[in-house]
Amino acid sequence: VVSNDHAFKQAHRIGTVNSINWARIVAQVVYYFKGYFAATKTNNEQVSFAVPSGNFGNICAGHVARMMGLPIKHLILATNENDVLDEFFRTGVYRPRTTVETKHTSSPSMDISKASNFERFIFDLTDRNANQVTELWAEVDQGNPFDLSGTPLFAKIQDYGFISGSSNHPARIATIREIYQNYH
């Protein structure tokens, strides 16, 4: 695969715009603004966005839009059974899963064991303290969780407007069925 051939990529100056590339996040910020202006009549209304998320990429763009001043009340993070992010927002514990612990689900785009964009939010949460983020991620890179539950940082999370939840396969199917029956 070309994306894994580093010599070829360097020789031909090829890059990717995947979910961890800052250019993609910046591009996604735009549609939070577009969505806001499409959903509101005045510029002082607050909105909330619900975002299915495994890698924290799209919702990170929402976080950036909010930091830029877009009046977002809540960013609702929805995960599947691989609930690493939901666990963090509920408990303050970030515990990436091993490959063996990561479940294969009916929503495979969220079958993520370690959210590669999450570090960006933690950087903001720590008041952009690069040393603290480096220490936290050193633990993660060694396969250990980090726990912010007993710290002022955990209480500060609510200031960013995040709400989270997870679903399982039967709940997703029931929701799809209900929406189809009621709105088709």
What is each residue range found by the language model?
Residues 1-184:
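PLP-dependent amino-acid enzyme catalytic core
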